[in-house]
């Protein structure tokens, strides 16, 4: 019942640009599967235009699994900076490690994203965010932590994570 209320038919005269533009940033050379799975989920859940900024070694696998996706090399910092404003949603972190490269990508997103964009921070980007005491870029920022990442973000030990305690940190 919930799915039927959330999913509607597309208009006959609509085009893919009407259904959102999403940029996914992640997928280190040895972890390309995570960003490809995230891009697939984004596409199959209805996003109109999906662009994946990832390591160049993931390009062939990306196109073989998701030919409708667009590719950007996440090491092309200038292109990343200039393209960020064209997306409605920016996802950063699937298939990344807590390292300087992820931190650079995350800081680029934080510095160049607009208040109108949604930012989803996942995976290694969560650990980078927590470890470097970065500021939340805007009110439309979403974190997707598992228990250990939530411990890093909130300072609450895994054994003490309870709904009411977690909520206090969020308020």
Which residues fall in each region the model found?
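Small-residue (G/A/S/T)-rich helix-start motifs and N-terminal tracts that mark the onset
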Residues: 1-119, 127-142, 147-171
């Amino acid at each position: 019942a919930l799915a039927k209320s959330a999913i509607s038919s597309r208009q006959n005269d609509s085009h893919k640009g009407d259904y959102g533009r999403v940029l996914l940033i992640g997928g280190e050379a040895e972890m390309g599967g995570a960003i490809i799975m995230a891009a697939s989920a984004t596409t199959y859940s209805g996003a109109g235009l999906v662009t994946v900024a990832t390591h160049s070694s993931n390009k062939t696998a990306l196109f073989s699994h998701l030919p409708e996706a667009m590719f950007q090399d996440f090491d092309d910092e200038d292109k990343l900076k200039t393209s960020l404003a064209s997306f409605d949603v920016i996802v950063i972190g699937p298939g990344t490690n807590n390292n300087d490269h992820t931190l650079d990508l995350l800081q680029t997103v934080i510095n160049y994203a607009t208040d109108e964009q949604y930012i989803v921070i996942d995976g290694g980007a969560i650990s980078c965010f927590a470890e470097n005491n970065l500021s939340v870029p805007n009110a439309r920022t979403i974190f997707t932590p598992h228990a250990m990442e939530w411990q890093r973000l909130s300072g609450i030990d895994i054994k003490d994570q309870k709904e009411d305690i977690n909520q206090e940190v969020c308020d």
